[in-house]
A protein has these predicted regions:
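Alpha-helical scaffolding within the catalytic cores
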Residues: 5-10, 33-36, 98-101, 122-125, ...
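His/Asp/Glu-enriched short active-site or ligand-binding loop at hydrolase and phosphoryl-transfer sites
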Residues: 136-147
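Histidine/acidic-residue-rich catalytic or RNA/ligand-binding cores of hydrolases
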Residues: 91-98, 123-132, 148-155, 175-188
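Active-site neighborhood of phospho(di)ester-bond hydrolases with catalytic His/Asp-centered motifs
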Residues: 23-24, 50, 113-116, 139-141, ...
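A generic "structured core" feature
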Residues: 104-107, 113, 175
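Mid-to-C-terminal alpha-helical segments outside catalytic/metal-binding sites
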Residues: 39, 160-167, 179-219
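Active-site environment of divalent metal-dependent phosphoester hydrolases
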Residues: 28-32, 56, 85-89, 119-127, ...
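Active-site gating/metal-coordination segments in enzymes
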Residues: 3-95, 136
Length: 219
């Protein structure tokens, strides 16, 4: 794998700071993670945190991470976490369960979190968590590849009344903005000729147009 350092992200953002916002990433199982956090936030000016628990090998609800959550909450740094499936055989799925973030959000209610990929295939857990906690959201990145699954996931969102907790995302460069938009907007077409309930077009468009930056405290 090609390593990408926080300094690389900061340099990239500096080329177009009026439209780009950089997130730092760290491994809280390593002894120098506090230094990385401080450097990325205070020295490089990165404004959020991206975590990959299944690759670093930690449970998000481990009490040893309380220092990280406390810092992110105090400095209003939104945290984006991978939740759900992975194709890496040695990455424990148990570290990606959305329900693990329930304990974190309960302990740190002002912490803003985004559960990436709607936690698929654990969408039910994800919906339960974002419904319960005011500042916990989910994104729909990298889901349009499986339109039937995505339809059912968003129908779950619709029935639980949590459309307002969803954020648009793409997982670029693995997919593009245009492909992601087309995939979302075409979901109801697979239902033609059936009596299955439709996803609300208005709710879908509202999600696409949502001011995510304000919700996450980034503007």
């Amino acid at each position: 794998a090609l390593p990408i350092y926080d300094s690389d992200i900061a340099t990239y953002v500096s080329r177009s700071p009026e439209r780009l916002i950089g997130f730092l990433s760290l491994d809280p199982t390593q002894p120098n993670w506090q230094q990385e956090l401080h450097q990325g936030h205070c020295e490089l000016g990165l404004r959020g945190i991206k975590l990959m628990p299944m690759y670093a090998g930690f449970r998000p609800d481990d009490e040893r991470l309380d220092e990280l959550w406390r810092y992110a909450s105090a400095h209003q740094l939104p945290v984006l976490l991978h939740t759900g499936t992975t194709f890496i055989s040695q990455a424990p799925l148990e570290f990606t369960y959305p329900r693990l973030l329930d304990k974190v959000a309960t302990k740190f209610p002002e912490l803003r979190m985004i559960l990436a990929h709607l936690g698929h295939p654990f969408e039910g857990e994800c919906v339960a968590v974002i419904r319960k906690h005011q500042h916990v959201y989910a994104d729909v990145s990298a889901l349009h590849y499986r339109p039937w699954q995505l339809y059912n996931s968003l129908m779950l969102v619709q029935e639980y009344g949590v459309w307002h907790k969803l954020l648009f995302g793409t997982d670029y460069p693995f997919t593009t903005v245009n492909d992601s938009l087309a995939g979302l907007r075409n979901l109801n077409t697979q239902l033609e000729g059936t009596r299955l309930p439709r996803l609300s077009v208005d709710a879908l468009e509202s999600m696409i147009q949502r001011d995510s930056l304000s919700l996450l405290g980034l503007i």
